[in-house]
Amino acid sequence: MLNSYVVREVSNDKLKWEYEFAVDKKYFLDQLDSKLSEIAMNVKVPGFRVGKASIDLVRKEYLNEAMTSVVKKTIESTSSDFVKNSKFGEIISSNIDIVSYPSYYSDNDKEEDLVYKLSFEVMPEAPLMDIDNIVLSDIEVDIQECDVNEFIENLKKQRPDFVIVDDPEYVIQGSDKLVIDYQNKIKGKILRGGSAKDFVLVLGKGVALREFEDQLIGMKVGESKTFPLTFPNDYGMVHLAGKTTDMSVTVKSVYVMKGMRDSEAIAKDYGFKDVGHMEDFARKRIKQQFDQMVFTIVKKELFDYMDANYVIDVPECVVTQEIAKINKEIRDSGEDIQIDVEKEAIKRVKLGMLLIKMSRHNNITIKNEDVFSFIQSNYADYGVDIGNVLKMLQSNKNFANYISGKVLEEKVINYIIGLAKKDKKVMTAKDISLMFENI
């Protein structure tokens, strides 16, 4: 194959290359004749035994099929031979445009060869970050008495005192506690797990779907109602996700909020030995919450440092994919987010390349326990059924790739944070919250 083709560079723009290949006409036609002979040996032509039809007849019937096969094979072999010997690195996108075909029935050697253009984009080698030059904040939260009191007040709000409503004309409000019966159907069939009797629901707590609670507001004790209810696509119960059902509800009792209970009653209600143990629990939970905020803040510091101190040519095709992801994130959020999408996409791709380089250089890999821990902290702790997440992990390749990428990213970030120089700070919970909100 060494002398069967010649290559001419058409363009070279950073990571994007284009070459024109001219495959020698004689070489190509020899390959085509070989393919026709192969077909002739195996094809059954009406009036002939297998392999006994003349080559002229086979050529007449199967030339186009053979031409297509040989063109494909020739392009694959010549382009891969060239790329392999040229050592471009990792090619992440490519395209073939055929310019001309040789004529099988012409003896004129001056007629065109098989000519095609190969354009491709390569993934550049990212530099290895020098962790010794990185200085990150080491923030310790100063938990004050007001923070503990606020936490306990929130506990009280979760379990206020309620008193039953005796007035049959009372209209349900958005903070009432209800006892209801409900039943879910699709096309008249009761759904598994979609019905309950004497179900206790406190409105406004985010326990039920907002659309469901909205239908209950304005009803009265003893009233029944049937309405369509559409479950979100990411609903925890997979068999209901994305479906519209006929929901029937009967209100059996209504309770209105009377007031907040004192700290001793709340401590007992939550199972604490006394108020002191509840306050100790509050400090631990506050620290956990703010440790996660601090991690996000420090990660932002690290990303800003990486973005400011490393200049990399990023592949256009990867940036295009990232732009599509960001636009989808914005649409799914339902918020009016104003950002330079292309700039954000370029930054994400660059940071990803730097983190991948760091992971490969230091042999940082992910294990099953890393994935499970990530799912626990990012899904299960927020009420999502971990079993459903694990099923998606096995059945949805895109979701599995997303989780793997996030887990590896977090592991590399923790590795860098652990080795970077530290600027120790003690900050109040309020100040940390303000920093977190401004990210």
Swiss-Prot record:
It holds the Pfam family FKBP_C. One of its GO terms (biological process) is protein transport. It is found in: Cytoplasm. One of its GO terms (molecular function) is peptidyl-prolyl cis-trans isomerase activity. Residues 175-260 form the PPIase FKBP-type domain. Keywords: Cell cycle, Cell division, Chaperone, Cytoplasm, Isomerase, Rotamase. Its EC number is 5.2.1.8. It catalyses: [protein]-peptidylproline (omega=180) = [protein]-peptidylproline (omega=0). InterPro entries: PPIase_dom_sf, PPIase_FKBP_dom, Trig_fac, Trigger_fac_C, Trigger_fac_C_sf, Trigger_fac_ribosome-bd_bac, Trigger_fac_ribosome-bd_sf, Trigger_fact/SurA_dom_sf. GO terms for cellular component: cytoplasm. Belongs to the FKBP-type PPIase family. Tig subfamily. Consists of 3 domains; the N-terminus binds the ribosome, the middle domain has PPIase activity, while the C-terminus has intrinsic chaperone activity on its own. Involved in protein export. Acts as a chaperone by maintaining the newly synthesized protein in an open conformation. Functions as a peptidyl-prolyl cis-trans isomerase. This is Trigger factor.
